[in-house]
């Protein structure tokens, strides 16, 4: 029931563009595994073996801490409507921050979001689909606006202060670039 690909076929690129949510998983050799839901129309397919997503401020910064030490990353998408399917993208990622040269090239590809803190650039070495027949059917209602409103109210300086206060280490004490 599963299929493996060495790149993202056109039909799966279309599937990705239609999804409202995806999940990202990372870990270091000795840390907890982090699995986070993402949305906000923050992901772009940059080619058959490359995707990037704009990461906004959240309650932690686990993904960035993990990628500095171990760049392995998995993204998962699942169909909640229509035909069932689960899509996983496996690869190695790099965290790109606002002071990195690549930021200037990649950031214009995204809708600007308040509190944006990194872009994760994922080079994909394996694509897998599986049936997804056990995934329930859900209806998309809309985006949550609380995070954008929170970041806009704090302003850029307030968000940076929040990063310094709360995002300098992961749950396992791994450093981030916000120390």
Can you name each region flagged by the protein language model?
Residues 1-179:
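Binding-site signature for planar aromatic cofactors or substrates
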């Amino acid at each position: 029931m599963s299929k493996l690909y060495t790149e993202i076929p056109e039909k799966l690129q279309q599937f990705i563009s239609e999804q409202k949510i995806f999940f990202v998983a990372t870990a270091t050799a000795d840390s907890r595994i982090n699995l986070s839901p993402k949305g906000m129309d923050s992901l772009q397919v940059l080619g058959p073996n490359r995707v990037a997503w704009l990461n906004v401020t959240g309650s932690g910064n686990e993904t960035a801490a993990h990628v500095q030490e171990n760049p392995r990353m998995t993204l998962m998408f699942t169909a909640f409507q229509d035909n069932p399917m689960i899509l996983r993208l496996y690869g190695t990622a790099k965290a790109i921050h606002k002071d990195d040269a690549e930021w200037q090239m990649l950031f214009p590809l995204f809708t600007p979001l308040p509190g944006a803190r990194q872009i994760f650039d994922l080079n994909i070495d394996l694509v897998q689909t599986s049936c997804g027949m056990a995934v329930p059917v859900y209806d998309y209602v809309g985006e949550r606006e609380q995070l954008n409103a929170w970041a806009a109210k704090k302003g850029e300086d307030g968000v940076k202060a929040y990063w310094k206060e709360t995002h300098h280490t992961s749950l396992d004490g791994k450093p981030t670039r916000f120390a």
